Amino acid sequence: MNRFILLLFCLSINQLFAQMINNESGQIFTETPFFNEKYIRSVKLKSITGTISSKKELGSIKISGKKEAYIFNENGNLTIHYLSSKNKNKSDTTFTFYEYNLKNENTIFRVSDSYGFYSYSKKYNDLGKLINKTYSREKNASKSKMNFKLEERYVIFEESYLYEEKDSIIEVTTLNSNGRPYQRQIYYYDSFNYLFKMHTRLLISNSTKQEKYTYNDRGYLKSIQYFINANETPIKELRYDYDEWGNVTFMDEYKDNVRVIHKELLYDPSTLILKTILSQDLVSNLITIIKYKPEFYN
C-alpha cells in the first residue's frame, strides 16, 4: 500500500515537469528558448543531438549530413543551439548562444553568421519586464565558434521599452536609439489572465498588425492568427495540439488559410524526452526527419 502511494506521488511530481517544451506564448521553434528548464533540470538532461534525413515525394529516405543540437546547463537553461551541414565536403555550422542572470532571465542572445557574430543584450526591471535591448556586432577572440570569447563589441543600435498597465491591458511603447517613440504594442488579457490579442502600430506610418490567440480546454495555446492592417483574413496561422502531459504533439502552419507545413513531435515514452520531429512541406511534399539522441549529466 505504501509503495502504491509512493508511486502515485512520484507520478504526480513528474507530471508537473513533464512538459519538455514550453509553448505558452507560441515560442516553439523560434529563437526564444522554448524548453521547460524545470523538466530539463529534473531529468538532468545535458543535450539532445539530432541527425537530419529527408525524403522527397516517391523517393527514399536520405541522410542529409546535417546535425542539430540543443545543449543545456545544469540549471536546465538552453545555452547553445547549433545546426551544421555539409555541402560538397565543406561543413558549415551556425551557433546560437544564450546567457542568463541569477533570475534565469535571458540576458544575451548571440548568433554566428558569415561575418562573425551578432548579439542582443537585454536588461530587465524588478518585475522581469524587458526594458532595454542592444544590438551589437562582435569579434571572437577564439579560433573556435563553439568556444566563443568576446574580443570586441560594436554597438549598432539600442531600443528601450516603457510600460503602462490599465486593468487587463498592457501598453508597451518602444523607443529608438535617440529615445524617440516609434512603435506601440497593446496586449489584451481576459479575466483568467490569458493573452487573447496583441495589437502593434508603427507611429510614423500608422501601419498596424495584430495577433489573436486561442486556447484549448486545459489552457494550452491552441492557435495564433497573424493579421496586417485592416485585413480580416490572417496572412499566417499556427495551430497546436498536445498529449495528456501537455507536450506539443503537432504544429500546423497556414498561409492565407492554406496549410503549408505539418510537424509532428514524438517523445520517448519512458522519459518524455523529445525523440523525433517529422516535418512535411505540403507544397513540395518534402519530408524532413530529425532523430535526437539524449545525453545526461552524471
Residue positions per predicted region:
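Buried hydrophobic residues that stabilize the cores of well-folded domains
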Residues: 19-298
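Bacterial Sec-dependent N-terminal signal peptides
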Residues: 1-25
